[in-house]
Swiss-Prot record:
The keyword Repeat does not apply. The gene is cbiD. Belongs to the CbiD family. It catalyses: Co-precorrin-5B + S-adenosyl-L-methionine = Co-precorrin-6A + S-adenosyl-L-homocysteine. This is Cobalt-precorrin-5B C(1)-methyltransferase. Pathway: Cofactor biosynthesis; adenosylcobalamin biosynthesis; cob(II)yrinate a,c-diamide from sirohydrochlorin (anaerobic route): step 6/10. Its EC number is 2.1.1.195. Keywords: Cobalamin biosynthesis, Methyltransferase, S-adenosyl-L-methionine, Transferase. One of its GO terms (biological process) is methylation. It comes from the Bacteria. The keyword Amino-acid biosynthesis does not apply.
Length: 362
């Protein structure tokens, strides 16, 4: 596969190889991984697998290959140890080993529904319970270079992939695929004119948990997708994303890859000025390390103003997005915005989101 495979697929491959070792089956250099969106299994390379502790448990190792392009998981070793659960109850028990992210210190394994489904699909059914521990030896180190901490994920990398193949959010091919997906979605006879546009893996995972539909995931090419949605006949479009991402739209930045443009704290400071913040409060925003930290600093001195600024941000995202689309044509599509915070709470919504999508939120 030229696009490479996401981390959950490599975890599932190592887990399946580990289970085969536990069952006493001979080692195979490739694990057959069943995927929810493919009729045929995918053969995924595995480095090694062996029984441990006198056959009471087994360990297998795979190495992540995300395909071409920059990706911090490249060559990341994935260790998966499996053992039978003592009580012999059916089902999987997933454990976060070293280097795997959890929800807060000592919290649950941070795993997406897709990643969990892959493991269950490839390891079950069994006539007894199976404990699966995932270990990423370099996960804690690599997590420092991600935005995991902004979402409350600590101690390592989160297993939050929502598909098998890696998508490059800044690549032109990724935009082409999103536009094809948009055309297919809006061309469906069941399409009724509403669309939730989600930004990034966390947004997609959160939207699915909230049972929002229909969904279209977009990377950094937001501007062209907004215009294409209007052209395709979307009537009501809801933008759902992390506040640290959607804030760029409030500043008129519609290709959001950080290599091209940032300006997040500058935009937030300008919105704070419009909202009437004091000079001292504006300095808190301007010199914060992130949008999340800026809101926390403001909330510490004036919680009501922090909440007002968040609502102002959601409104600005709606207004600037609507103005962007209007530059290219006269369509009836209305754009709403909902922003979530590091705790993955749908925190702020603009007036259009409240008017057109309030049933999704309440």
């Amino acid at each position: 596969m030229s696009s490479g495979l996401t981390l959950p697929v490599w975890v599932a491959a190592a887990a399946k190889a580990s289970l085969h070792a536990l069952l006493g089956q001979p080692f195979a250099a490739q694990a057959s991984v069943s995927l929810p969106d493919r009729p045929a299994p995918l053969l995924v390379p595995v480095i090694s697998a062996a029984r441990l502790d006198g056959g009471e448990q087994a360990l297998a190792i795979s190495r992540c290959d995300p395909g071409p392009g920059l990706d911090l998981t490249r060559d990341l070793e994935i260790w998966v140890r499996v053992s039978w659960t003592p009580d012999k109850q059916a089902g999987l028990t997933l454990l976060a080993g070293a280097g795997v992210g959890t929800r807060g210190a000592g919290g649950d394994l941070c795993v997406s529904a897709y990643a969990r489904d892959l493991l269950e699909r490839n390891l079950l059914p069994l006539d007894r319970g199976l404990t699966v521990e995932v270990v990423l030896p370099k996960g804690r180190e690599l997590a420092l270079r991600t935005s995991n901490a902004a979402f409350g994920v600590v101690d390592g990398l989160a297993l939050i992939g929502t598909q098998a193949e890696v998508q490059r959010s800044a690549a032109p091919d990724q935009l082409k695929q999103v536009l094809l997906d948009l055309a297919q979605l809006t061309g469906d006879p069941e399409f009724r004119g509403d669309l939730i546009l989600v930004i990034g893996e966390n947004g997609l995972d959160l939207a699915r948990q909230a049972q929002l539909a229909p969904l279209l995931k977009v990377g950094n090419w937001l501007g062209p997708v907004l215009v294409a949605a209007a052209e395709a006949g979307v009537q009501n479009l809801l933008l759902l994303g992390y506040h640290g991402k959607l804030i760029k739209l409030a500043g008129g930045i519609f290709h959001t890859h950080h290599h091209l443009a940032d300006g997040r704290l500058e935009v937030l400071t300008a919105l704070g000025f419009d909202a009437g913040l004091s000079l001292q409060q504006l300095r808190l925003l301007r010199h914060a390390q992130s949008v999340e930290q800026a809101f926390k600093a403001l909330a510490a001195v004036n919680p009501a103003m922090a909440e007002q600024l968040g609502q102002q941000l959601a409104l600005a995202v709606e207004q600037r997005s609507q103005a962007y689309v209007a530059r290219y044509g006269d369509w009836p599509m209305r754009i709403g915005a909902v922003l979530f915070d590091r705790n993955r709470h749908l925190r702020w919504r603009g007036p259009v989101a409240g008017e057109r999508f309030f049933t999704l939120m309440d």
